[in-house]
A protein has these predicted regions:
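N-terminal localization/anchoring segments of enzymes in phospholipid and broader phosphate metabolism
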Residues: 1-264, 268, 272, 296, ...
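Conserved SAM-binding loop
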Residues: 65, 279, 337
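Glycine- and other small-residue-rich loops at beta-strand/loop junctions that grip anionic moieties
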Residues: 92, 282-283, 317
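A general structural signal for well-ordered alpha-helical packing
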Residues: 263, 270, 291, 304, ...
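Helical hairpin unit composed of two closely spaced alpha helices linked by a short loop
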Residues: 273, 283-304, 309, 314
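Phosphate-/nucleic-acid-contacting segments
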Residues: 276
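C-terminal structural cap/anchor segments
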Residues: 302-306, 310-363
Length: 425
């Protein structure tokens, strides 16, 4: 479903980079044996990401989950200030303000100190938030910069293929991802739709390599720079052993192949759920397979809860999101709306065992059209941190009862019409 075919030129260039990176994607088989001894179901998910999508799972990685942008941001600044060798950043939206201003000041300083600073931003995501050809301005400051898939004044389906990832890698051993873009509303420095609820995760250790691979893949497709990737490995600038608990597997999704990785990860988690499944998503625009999986989970006794916004950022998309409520609710799925405002987080947690935190919305664009990323977590402390955040968020949210779902004929008609255009929204 959806367009999974960006330009042939971009596809060819990324495939060339992938050939160079192939030897750096090897899976430690002893880790697979360990996981198989614990849980064969989780092993299937892990092997899918490792064998088919080529993102290995790692131990020796410490994770820290952030339940808000304002908790994530100071730690991000602190880690940026520690950079000694390189900083890689890949973001969908950059908007001038306090958040980007504080980060940019550090990036300029680090570039002057000889740190390799590279920045990728999506040209469409930042179309209305950055000056035209902003990358030239950053290059003058010593920051290597590329705008992904530049917007052109012609109608093209390729414009749908956006880089929706949020990745920060510092010296190969520290990484960040999640839903947080580089704009003030994400840290509640500026109010747009009530309180802005978002989440992020920091990795320290070997699993950061998968985030680095994602960045290097697109960067070198746009600007061929690297032939030797050894210096970007986690242990290159951190020869000491890493601490860690549990298993960590960052993964990417792209419209370059026929694998709907983001959707498959979600489906695997939903289908394996036995006790509970909690999910955050700003948009709930899903296909029949996802609807069936969620409904079946609820029907077999799983406590399925989904949190969407109370105050939307896009009213038409929100109306479409609400059109899915009744079918899910009738099957036993509990729908909540985040009362304080807008929830932009993209998380799923299940049975105190597994969770995923990343950039992937439950909508057609994220699942089929965009470059995305997430982190699959198994038996880490962060899994329970996501669960606790979900419980606290649900307490602040409004449970959508059948009474609240009642609406008039014309709204039902409008939602039915919107459903026809769901893949475009």
């Amino acid at each position: 479903c959806g367009n999974k075919k960006p330009t042939r030129k971009l596809r060819r260039k990324i495939e060339q980079v992938d050939t160079l990176l192939e030897e750096y994607r090897k899976q430690d088989k002893t880790i697979l044996k360990e996981i198989g001894a614990f849980d064969k179901g989780v092993l299937g998910q892990v092997k899918y990401l490792s064998n088919i999508v080529k993102f290995p799972i790692y131990k020796n990685t410490r994770t820290q989950y952030f339940e808000s942008g304002e908790k994530n941001f100071p730690v991000m600044l602190q880690e940026l200030k520690k950079a000694k060798h390189f900083i890689f950043m890949e973001y969908f939206i950059i908007h001038d303000g306090r958040m980007w201003g504080d980060i940019l000041e550090i990036l300029k300083q680090k570039a002057k100190q000889g740190v390799e600073v590279r920045l990728l931003y999506d040209d469409f995501g930042s179309l209305t938030t950055l000056p035209y050809q902003y990358y030239k301005e950053l290059e003058e400051c010593g920051i290597h910069c590329e705008a992904f898939n530049p917007v052109v004044p012609i109608l093209s389906i390729v414009m749908n293929n956006r880089d929706h990832r949020k990745i920060l890698v510092i010296d190969g051993h520290t990484g960040f991802t999640g839903g947080i873009n580089l704009s003030d509303e994400y840290i509640n420095e500026k109010e747009r739709f009530g309180y802005w609820k978002d989440t992020g995760i920091m990795l320290k250790g070997e699993a950061v390599w998968n985030l680095t691979l994602m960045f290097l893949e697109i960067w070198n497709a746009l600007r061929p720079t690297d032939q030797n990737f050894e210096e970007f490995l986690p242990h290159h600038y951190h020869p000491e052993p890493f601490e860690g608990d549990g298993y960590v597997q960052p993964y990417g999704d792209s419209p370059l192949d026929e694998e709907t990785v983001g959707e498959n990860v979600y489906l695997n988690i939903i289908n394996a759920a036995q006790e509970y499944l909690y999910a955050f998503t700003p948009y709930l625009i899903i296909d029949n397979e996802m609807i069936t999986a969620l409904c079946l989970a609820a029907k077999r006794g799983v406590d399925v809860r989904i949190v969407t916004p109370q105050i939307p950022d896009k009213k038409t998309v929100f109306c479409l999101t609400q059109s899915y409520y009744r079918q899910l609710s009738e099957a036993g799925v509990k729908i909540y709306q985040f009362t304080p405002g807008f929830i932009h987080a993209k998380c799923m947690v299940c049975d105190d065992k597994v969770a995923t935190v990343g950039t992937i919305n439950l909508d057609y664009r994220s699942l089929y059209l965009h470059f995305e990323c997430g982190v699959f977590l198994y038996q880490t402390k962060s899994v329970l941190a996501v669960k606790e955040d979900a419980k606290k968020t649900i307490e602040k949210s409004t449970f959508i009862t059948p009474e609240l779902m009642k609406q008039g004929f014309f709204k039902n008609l409008w939602q039915a019409i919107l459903r026809l255009f769901a893949p475009l929204m």
